[in-house]
Amino acid sequence: MRRPRRLRSLSAHSSGFTLIELLIAMMILGILMAYLVPKIPEAIEEAKITASRKNLSDIYQGLTTYQAKFGRLPSESGVKFFAVLISKGVWENTKASAKKLTCPGVDIGALAIRDLPPEEWYKDLDAVNGDYSAYAGRNCKEYPLRNASGKDCWIATDNDPEMNFRTTTLVLMGDGTTDRLEIADLQEQGVLAKDEEYLQVGPDSPYE
């Protein structure tokens, strides 16, 4: 005759956690929360910086396509410098294309385009102004572009009225590279004072 299997004891033993096991699990969870939660905002911002760099890379490719189509680089200034990608048909006027022309570090609600559908943002170049994007385009009126050069700044996160990212400014150069400027580095280089935590973009910028 088979001996009865003692399933009841096994079932009872595995029916739940003991108090000690629960306390240990809660302690481990607390440690993980204390370590990970403060890093979540940093991780989110870094993801937005990566997305912004991708936008700038795509814009550069668009501007080189513009040059191939029209035999020159755009002569417009500010946001219009890159808004021509949509207004002149280099890019298809879609929501995805329009969203590439502004920095993901700044909420759309802070811009003049907040109440417009994306397909209307850059369709009419005459309506576009500096409040239509969180990127600052080159001032081609005072600094015209003739050829692509790694020494020329084309587009940057505009930092207007405050930093797009907490400590980071991105600058698209004429050779397609994107420079990452950090406040701490600029302080060490003497570009900013030790207590300055804001980098102005534009003609009055301390960074050349």
Predicted regions and their residues:
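Acidic, glycine-rich loop-and-strand cores that form catalytic or ligand-binding grooves
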Residues: 92-153
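C-terminal accessory segments of extracellular proteins
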Residues: 154-208
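Short catalytic/ligand-binding loop motif for oxyanion handling, primarily in non-cytosolic enzymes
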Residues: 67-68, 74-76, 81-85, 109-113, ...
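N-terminal leader/signal peptides at the extreme start of proteins
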Residues: 1-17
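N-terminal single-pass transmembrane signal-anchor helix
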Residues: 13-40
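Acidic surface patches and DE-rich sequence motifs
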Residues: 13, 137, 173
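Conserved hydrophobic/amphipathic alpha-helical signal-anchor segments
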Residues: 34-100
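Structural recognition of the beta-strand scaffold that forms the well-ordered cores
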Residues: 67, 74, 100-104, 155-156, ...
